[in-house]
């Protein structure tokens, strides 16, 4: 019988992603044959993989790949952050992004049928990864972004790959595009412009903002601070010409009541109108890229900065691992009880 050395176990683990004990057992059963051990691990793992199908996988990584004028960003999930750092897992994520960019599938169903370099389909690769790594590994989503020769991609990953961003910039180079992607990673916009926000969504978000103002006003009243006014608007989409005109007239009335000479109104009104727009577009600032203060130049919004350099953002995609996935939070006592019951064979 072949000697099962630590080096042999390590080699098998690196190739298969299996745990120490599983790798050692497989080598013992196959008399130290690495290839047979990998196949054995896979066979044993298939049954385990089926049992893991219903588990929640909310950790993982994003992958970003640029192929000429096509770029892909993908999210791949695992059950634990520890496995997300596994070399086999990282390679799977990066290969998936490459295959998606080159294959340009229409949806997840089509993506799962794409061929991996190993010859297996994407779907088969994930079943095998679940089997060998030992916990549920799942391909969650992807986005494809395309550009012209004259445009630039901004590819960026943040926080060890937990956030992946691709942006397309027209009229700028890759440096600007990457800076825009860095902003997107940090500030979490969901759409490019206020024109893409749903009307009811804006109303709901405005209600939440006003609720927070009301809570703050309760605290302010307790210490005799002046209360803050509730907001009527949350997005530029709600600021019609009539609303803007009415706001300007209200400012003029305020200046007249304060006794300010009319000859200096033209110097005061623009600043007050800017403040009105800032206060009444808070939903835009939270969710739309162009309305946000640019992290590279906080004296300007992203839109104002882009205008100053004659550039524009055409499109972007941002993935953050685990977005929208509800993680299981088991009661500790119940978990201990379940573990004891399993140990006792109940």
UniProtKB/Swiss-Prot annotation:
Segments for region (Involved in Mg(2+) ion dislocation from EF-Tu): 80-83
GO-annotated cellular components: cytoplasm
Pfam families cross-referenced by the UniProt entry: EF_TS
Keywords for this protein: Cytoplasm, Elongation factor, Protein biosynthesis
MF terms (GO), sorted A to Z: translation elongation factor activity
Cellular localisation: Cytoplasm
Cited function: Associates with the EF-Tu.GDP complex and induces the exchange of GDP to GTP. It remains bound to the aminoacyl-tRNA.EF-Tu.GTP complex up to the GTP hydrolysis stage on the ribosome.
The family this protein is said to belong to: Belongs to the EF-Ts family.
Protein name listed in UniProt: Elongation factor Ts
Organism of this sequence: Streptococcus suis (strain 05ZYH33)
Underlying gene: tsf
């Amino acid at each position: 019988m072949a000697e099962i050395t630590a080096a042999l176990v390590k080699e098998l683990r690196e190739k298969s992603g299996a745990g120490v004990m599983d790798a050692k057992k497989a080598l013992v059963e196959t008399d130290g044959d690495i290839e047979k051990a990998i196949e054995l691990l896979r066979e044993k793992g298939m049954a385990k993989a089926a049992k893991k199908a219903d588990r929640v996988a909310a950790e993982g990584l994003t992958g970003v790949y640029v192929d000429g004028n096509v770029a892909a960003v993908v999210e791949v999930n695992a059950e634990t952050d520890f496995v997300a750092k596994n070399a086999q897992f990282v390679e799977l994520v990066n290969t998936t992004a490459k295959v998606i960019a080159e294959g340009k599938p229409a949806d997840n169903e089509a993506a799962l049928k794409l061929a991996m370099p190993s010859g297996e389909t994407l779907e088969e690769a994930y079943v095998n990864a679940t089997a060998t790594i030992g916990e549920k590994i799942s391909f969650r989503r992807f986005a494809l972004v395309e550009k012209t020769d004259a445009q630039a991609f901004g590819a960026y990953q943040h926080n060890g790959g937990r956030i992946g961003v691709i942006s397309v910039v027209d009229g700028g180079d890759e440096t600007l595009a990457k800076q825009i992607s860095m902003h997107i990673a940090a500030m979490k916009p969901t759409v490019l412009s206020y024109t893409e926000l749903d009307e009811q969504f804006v109303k709901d978000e405005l209600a939440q903002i006003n609720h927070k103002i009301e809570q703050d006003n309760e605290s302010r009243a307790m210490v005799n601070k002046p209360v803050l006014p509730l907001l009527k608007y949350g997005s530029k989409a709600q600021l019609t010409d009539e609303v803007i005109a009415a706001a300007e007239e209200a400012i003029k009335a305020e200046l007249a009541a304060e006794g300010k000479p009319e000859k200096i109104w033209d110097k005061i009104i623009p600043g007050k109108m800017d403040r009105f727009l800032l206060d009444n577009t808070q939903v835009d600032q939270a969710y739309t890229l162009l309305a946000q203060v640019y992290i590279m130049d906080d004296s300007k919004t992203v839109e104002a900065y882009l205008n100053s350099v004659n550039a524009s953002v055409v499109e972007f995609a941002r993935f953050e691992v685990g977005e929208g996935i509800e993680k299981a939070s088991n009661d500790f006592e119940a978990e201990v009880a379940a573990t004891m019951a399993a140990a006792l064979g109940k």
